[in-house]
Swiss-Prot record:
Subunit record text: Heteromultimeric protein consisting of LacA and LacB.
InterPro entries reported in the protein's UniProt record: LacA, RpiB_LacA_LacB, RpiB_LacA_LacB_sf
One MF term in the entry's GO annotations: ribose-5-phosphate isomerase activity
Family designation: Belongs to the LacAB/RpiB family.
EC number: 5.3.1.26
Pathway of action: Carbohydrate metabolism; D-galactose 6-phosphate degradation; D-tagatose 6-phosphate from D-galactose 6-phosphate: step 1/1
Group of enzyme by EC: isomerase
Protein name: Galactose-6-phosphate isomerase subunit LacA 2
Record field: catalytic activity: aldehydo-D-galactose 6-phosphate = keto-D-tagatose 6-phosphate
GO BP annotation list: D-allose catabolic process; galactose catabolic process; lactose catabolic process via tagatose-6-phosphate; pentose-phosphate shunt, non-oxidative branch
Segment forming the signal sequence: none
UniProtKB keywords: Isomerase, Lactose metabolism
Keyword check for Isomerase: yes
Amino acid sequence: MAIIIGADKAGQELKEVIKDYLKEGKYEVVDVSENEVRDFVDTTLAVAKEVNASEDNLGIVIDAYGVGSFMVATKIKGMVAAEVSDERSAYMTRGHNNARIITLGSEISAPGIAKNIIKGFVEGKYDGGRHQVRVDMLNKMC
């Protein structure tokens, strides 16, 4: 599993904190905005492309408020994404919704909270079962 991460200009500082945190946890991290800072639309599309390259990959996109990146991610066929600003939602969106991308706002989530959000997301596992009906509905929408 690789964690694909990207950020626009507003999210670069928080992205580096999260990237370091993930690397300390021995996760494979792919930064799609390491060499070129792009708009959140292009960054989100780049993250989603890499997430879709492997069923095990997860994605994290950071912009100022998390909303713009979320809107882009939800337009991608087969992608379930969640905008999160707390630890429990990050964990539950993996378990119940099989979200493969989360978006965060650097103006919303402080570094300590962001690390806990990331922990919940990457450690969460999809529960399947009764939740699959909802995931199937989401996947039919795009």
